[in-house]
């Protein structure tokens, strides 16, 4: 086993997420090495070096922040949010948008020939939003519109280039 974690990056990533719930995974784009891998909140692994007390175990399993879940591997998230950075990148690479392109988020987005509007998590909308703001705010409407402008075939072809729809060959738990 060869560890590829960059300790400085790992420490930096930890500082960014230590009081939050989520995960950070950073890969080297040249060779696929995992250089940072964080799941938060964490817990003291030393609790398990000997027999963990019932009290400590109950604290962990009853913690509403769920520290025993490895969010990077076992977390369950809507795929839309995990695809947003890729949709944005593909639209940039295909010159569909540039980093300053503004798209208005009114809180909902309607597709032609579709009865129900798709809603943004922020009911009142984000207003005019560029790519950077839309990523940091996870603005659904911005990415609905960018995906529509880019087209499903272009998105699908490019996602495949990034490894979507392919086996990872990673030995992950479950």
Go through each PLM region and give its residues:
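Conserved, well-ordered alpha-helix/loop/beta-strand core segments that scaffold catalytic motifs
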Residues: 1-23, 30
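Beta-lactam-recognizing serine transpeptidase/beta-lactamase-like catalytic domain environment
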Residues: 5, 30-81, 86-174
């Amino acid at each position: 086993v060869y560890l590829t974690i960059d300790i400085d990056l790992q420490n930096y990533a930890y500082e960014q997420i230590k009081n939050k719930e989520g995960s950070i995974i950073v890969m080297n784009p040249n060779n696929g090495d995992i250089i940072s891998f964080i799941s938060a909140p964490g817990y003291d692994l030393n609790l398990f070096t000997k027999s963990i007390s019932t009290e400590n175990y109950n604290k962990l399993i009853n913690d509403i922040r769920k520290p025993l879940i490895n969010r990077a591997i076992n977390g369950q998230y809507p795929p839309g949010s995990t695809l947003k950075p890729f949709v944005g990148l593909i639209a940039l690479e295909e010159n569909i948008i540039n980093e300053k392109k503004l798209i208005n988020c009114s809180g909902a987005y309607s597709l032609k020939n579709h009865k129900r509007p798709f809603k943004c998590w922020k009911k009142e909308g984000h207003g005019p939003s560029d790519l950077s703001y839309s990523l940091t705010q996870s603005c659904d409407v911005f990415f609905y519109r960018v995906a529509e402008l880019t087209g499903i075939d272009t998105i699908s072809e490019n996602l495949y280039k990034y490894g979507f729809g392919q086996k990872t060959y990673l030995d992950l738990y479950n």
